[in-house]
């Protein structure tokens, strides 16, 4: 079964646990998701069954939009409410102070990813190392914050809506916000609203050809050549310039790359549902 859709992950389950629920619900064996949500987080999770898991890397998932609540004064090594180690009782902040912090954290930001994250450290997920207490470091990275709106402030909880680039961490954004205020913060709630154009629509199966953000190309020879994965050259196609292209046929899809006057198959002969 090949399918792709947006699911709504509840809180309290890891993304893998939720995926197993969906596999049982739909009676499938092969499934995957794009963009891990932590157990305390909820919301939009792109899920695919069968061969459609191969298309994740070709989806445009920027910007990612979240609604989150930060707890000002709470310390947590994981940056969320699952590992709180200390809570400081603080006086409420003036709206002007919060607005100054918000405005200073737009555009490209350098940050250190959370140690409790799915980052790969020599073949092991960072969160697994963090849970064992093993010492390690993560490299500084960059994310882009396109917009951020403060929705409400009921001290010590500040709720905001943020739009950021793929790969960015809302927990890291909250840590940067806390530094502007001079105190630790952690997230008490996190919900992913959308990834690019992908939003939850009651698990409606999506048309793979409509959601792939790739230009189309056309092979001028026999379709059997594509099905057999034969070596091809740019002159065999209507468009010869470098790029990644979708080839759509009645029963299957292929993705090719034209680069330096050569053709390579990114994906070949994926059956259409």
From Swiss-Prot:
InterPro entries documented for this protein: PsdUridine_synth_cat_dom_sf (IPR020103), PsdUridine_synth_N (IPR002501), tRNA_psdUridine_synth_TruB (IPR014780)
Keyword Nucleotide-binding recorded: no
Keyword Signal listed: no
MF-aspect GO terms: RNA binding; tRNA pseudouridine(55) synthase activity
Pfam family, one: TruB_N
Superkingdom, natural source: Bacteria
Keywords on record: Isomerase, tRNA processing
Active-site residues annotated for this sequence: 38 (nucleophile)
Reactions this protein catalyses: uridine(55) in tRNA = pseudouridine(55) in tRNA
GO biological process, one term: tRNA pseudouridine synthesis
Record EC number: 5.4.99.25
Function (record text): Responsible for synthesis of pseudouridine from uracil-55 in the psi GC loop of transfer RNAs.
Record-stated family: Belongs to the pseudouridine synthase TruB family. Type 1 subfamily.
Protein name as catalogued: tRNA pseudouridine synthase B
Organism encoding this protein: Campylobacter curvus (strain 525.92)
Gene behind the chain: truB
